[in-house]
UniProtKB/Swiss-Prot annotation:
GO biological process, one term: translation
Protein name: Large ribosomal subunit protein uL22
Gene Ontology molecular function: rRNA binding; structural constituent of ribosome
A Pfam family matched in the record: Ribosomal_L22
Family: Belongs to the universal ribosomal protein uL22 family.
Matches recorded under PANTHER family: CHLOROPLAST 50S RIBOSOMAL PROTEIN L22-RELATED, LARGE RIBOSOMAL SUBUNIT PROTEIN UL22M
Keywords from the UniProt entry: Ribonucleoprotein, Ribosomal protein, RNA-binding, rRNA-binding
Subunit structure comment from the entry: Part of the 50S ribosomal subunit.
Cystine residue pairs: none
Function text: This protein binds specifically to 23S rRNA; its binding is stimulated by other ribosomal proteins, e.g. L4, L17, and L20. It is important during the early stages of 50S assembly. It makes multiple contacts with different domains of the 23S rRNA in the assembled 50S subunit and ribosome. The globular domain of the protein is located near the polypeptide exit tunnel on the outside of the subunit, while an extended beta-hairpin is found that lines the wall of the exit tunnel in the center of the 70S ribosome.
Record's GO cellular component terms: cytosolic large ribosomal subunit
Length: 111
């Protein structure tokens, strides 16, 4: 019986481009291996993605009663979120706009 479990984190305060670098490393891997890679990755995105994967594992355990050892990351999608617009002061009384990027991380686990 094929089972799919999802976990979504919306509005993560990191750019989608940086998060996709981490997501590409764990796509298709078993849960134990994926969490091991995320634990030892120095990137900020790895910490955020790890939280989402752990949430998906908890969903599988609690909602579906799944065996964790059989699960793998079947899909991980990183979409661009809304940009927070901020201004920074420049010379001669001017200002420049800075966009603080956000992203939506969606993790799907299956057995």
């Amino acid at each position: 019986m094929m089972m799919e479990v999802k976990a979504i984190h919306k509005g993560a305060r990191i750019s989608a481009q940086k998060t996709r670098l981490v997501a590409d490393q764990i796509r298709g891997l078993p849960i134990a291996r994926a969490l091991n890679i995320l634990n030892f990755s120095p990137k900020k995105a790895a910490f955020i993605v790890k939280k989402v994967v752990e949430s998906a594992v908890a969903n599988a355990e609690h909602n579906k009663g799944a065996d964790i050892d059989e699960l793998k990351v079947s899909a991980i999608i990183v979409d661009k979120g809304t940009s927070l617009k901020r201004f920074t002061a420049r010379a001669k009384g001017r200002g420049n706009q800075i966009e603080k990027q956000t992203c939506h991380i969606s993790v799907t686990l299956s057995n």
